[in-house]
């Protein structure tokens, strides 16, 4: 563990230092389960779960308990009835990072681990993809080329959803996005019923603004980080692999890429990266990294090697 030479709100760890903080946290995840959680191109193994995610699960367990004590203290000050222990105030975790950096896998593994704790068995995971405007609306606004940028999301609807969950509503509904069809599924809803923990995963969840934003409602946030050059290579590799998986489906919005030979597919992937994903990362996503409670820094082989925890 290292503290920066200048006064800083952060503590930095290498993986060896971080894994020591696991204490006796048990591993309740099998190799078969991990394979089901792993995203395309991801290399996470049980050793990384043990050394990185179990200490994180322990930290979050401690923070959930501390947050509930804080809510109870506020209720006591206000003279309000103590909260029902069976319906605590939901703990909200944000997971941010670039396309292809592995944030979805991070969120799924975290959900699986946290759901195994006795004190918070209901852990829901929602992605912000569902809050993208439908393609017809993006076309009307001339935003199809900006899909994934902050302005392509229905931020008011996202804010209403997270506020509803946080305030203890019996249920809240999120729209559902189809990566196959590259569009919102009309009428489809993901229903969230008063979770103990809600994980919200998306590109821009740590964005700030002149008014209240979803990041203001987070109790904890993660940023999955890596060198831009490494993320680009991961994106290209994933694009190539998807030609024989998701893109191969005739119903896929990107089916026309499935027959491209390697050289042409690489050119197509790098063009998408250069015109959409890299600008969004540099202009909108990367500037939110300092807001994260914990930054997970990956090496070129996808493994998490360093972590930075905000202590203040």
Curated annotation (Swiss-Prot):
Q: What's a Gene Ontology MF term here?
A: pantothenate kinase activity
Compartment(s) of residence:
Cytoplasm
EC number, UniProt record: 2.7.1.33
> Can you supply one Gene Ontology CC term for this chain's record?
cytoplasm
Q: Which UniProt keywords apply?
A: ATP-binding, Coenzyme A biosynthesis, Cytoplasm, Kinase, Nucleotide-binding, Transferase
Protein name per UniProt: Pantothenate kinase
Q: Which InterPro entries match?
A: P-loop_NTPase, PanK, PRK/URK
Q: Which family does it belong to?
A: Belongs to the prokaryotic pantothenate kinase family.
Pathway(s): Cofactor biosynthesis; coenzyme A biosynthesis; CoA from (R)-pantothenate: step 1/5
Q: Which reaction does it catalyse?
A: (R)-pantothenate + ATP = (R)-4'-phosphopantothenate + ADP + H(+)
GO biological process terms, alphabetically, are: coenzyme A biosynthetic process
Residue numbers binding ATP: 97-104
Regions that span the bilayer: none
Q: SUPFAM superfamilies this protein is in?
A: P-loop containing nucleoside triphosphate hydrolases
């Amino acid at each position: 563990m290292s503290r920066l030479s200048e006064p800083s709100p952060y503590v930095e760890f290498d993986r060896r230092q971080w894994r020591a903080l696991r204490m006796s946290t048990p591993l309740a995840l099998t190799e078969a389960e991990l394979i089901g959680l792993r995203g395309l191109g991801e290399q996470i193994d049980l050793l990384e779960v043990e050394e990185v995610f179990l200490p994180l699960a322990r930290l979050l367990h401690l923070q959930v308990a501390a947050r509930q004590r804080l809510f109870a203290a506020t209720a006591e000050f206000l003279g309000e009835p103590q909260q029902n222990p069976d319906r605590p105030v939901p703990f909200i975790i944000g997971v941010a990072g670039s396309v292809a950096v592995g944030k979805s896998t991070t969120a799924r593994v975290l959900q699986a681990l946290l759901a195994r704790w006795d004190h918070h068995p209901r852990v829901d995971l929602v992605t912000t993809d569902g809050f993208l405007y439908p393609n017809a609306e993006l076309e009307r606004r001339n935003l199809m080329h900006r899909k994934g940028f902050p302005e392509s999301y229905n931020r008011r609807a996202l804010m209403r959803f997270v506020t509803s969950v946080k305030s203890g509503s019996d249920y809240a509904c999120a729209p559902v996005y189809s990566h196959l069809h590259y569009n919102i599924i009309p009428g489809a809803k993901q229903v969230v019923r008063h979770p103990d923990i809600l994980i919200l995963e998306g590109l821009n969840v740590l964005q700030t603004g002149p008014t209240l934003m979803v990041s203001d409602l987070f109790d904890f946030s993660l940023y999955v980080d890596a060198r831009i050059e490494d993320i680009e290579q991961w994106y290209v590799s994933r694009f190539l692999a998807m030609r024989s998986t998701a893109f191969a489906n005739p119903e896929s919005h990107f089916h026309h890429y499935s027959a491209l030979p390697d050289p042409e597919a690489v050119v197509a992937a790098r063009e998408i990266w250069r015109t959409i994903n890299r600008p969004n990362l540099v202009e909108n996503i990367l500037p939110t990294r300092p807001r994260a409670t914990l930054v997970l820094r990956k090496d070129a082989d996808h493994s998490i090697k360093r972590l930075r925890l905000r202590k203040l």
